[in-house]
Design a protein with these regions (language model features):
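Short, basic/glycine-rich phosphate-binding loops at helix/coil junctions
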Residues: 23-38, 62-67, 90-93
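Substrate-recognition "cap/lid" segment bordering the active-site pocket of phosphatases
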Residues: 69-120, 126-129
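A structural signal for well-ordered alpha-helical scaffolds and beta->alpha junctions
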Residues: 11, 48-51, 78-83, 104, ...
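Substrate-recognition element of Asp-dependent hydrolases with the DxDx(T/V) motif
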Residues: 42-47, 51-86
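Anion (oxyanion) recognition and catalysis
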Residues: 2, 56-60, 133
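Asp-based, Mg2+/Mn2+-dependent phosphohydrolase catalytic module
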Residues: 108-118, 125-170
């Protein structure tokens, strides 16, 4: 955001709400997120922490296949860039399915088809982790600055993909 002229409000670095973090309207935030999500940058997102190593291990050594549900965009070019980025980072077969919802959309409806499946659901947004819990998924929340004080009886906080790997394989 700084490269586009937006300065962070002092003391707001850990706030998930970008309108608070940058002192701009929610409408402007939505527009900026959509612009970013539909840009070429989506094809070059870096992997989070140790995810490349542990996702590959889960997939290649243990046969896990991943489904990604992302509130990216309905734009087909953005969707394709995201799929290409995931394949580049994790290999061509780790992600069996990528579901792209509209920018900022809630994931409740998309998660309904997994109801009762008992799958592991990895999230970074507490509201989406809770949506996974409501349909019976085993919810893991990756810790970030914006969610590090979150607590829910049925959502386990993990610091990284090593923690996820250890939970799954123990």
């Amino acid at each position: 955001m700084q490269e586009h002229g937006f300065e962070e409000v002092p003391g707001s670095k850990l706030n998930y709400d970008m309108s608070v973090r940058y002192g701009i309207s929610r409408d402007q935030v939505k527009k900026l997120i959509r612009i970013f999500n539909e840009s070429a940058a989506i094809g070059f997102l870096p992997a989070l922490r140790d995810s490349m190593y542990y996702v590959k291990r889960l997939h290649e050594e243990l046969g896990y296949r991943f489904h990604c549900i992302t509130s990216l965009s309905l734009d087909p070019n953005a969707q394709r860039l995201r799929e290409m980025n995931l394949a580049k980072l994790f290999g061509p077969t780790a992600f069996e399915r990528v579901v792209c919802l509209d920018t900022g959309a809630h994931k409740d409806d998309a998660l309904e088809e997994y109801e009762g499946a008992g799958c592991v659901w990895v999230e970074d947004k507490p509201e989406n982790a809770e949506a996974g819990f409501r349909v019976g998924l085993n919810c893991l929340l990756i810790e970030h600055g914006h969610n590090m004080h979150y607590y829910h009886d049925h959502v386990r906080i993990v610091k990284n993909w090593r923690g996820i790997y250890e939970l799954i394989t123990s």
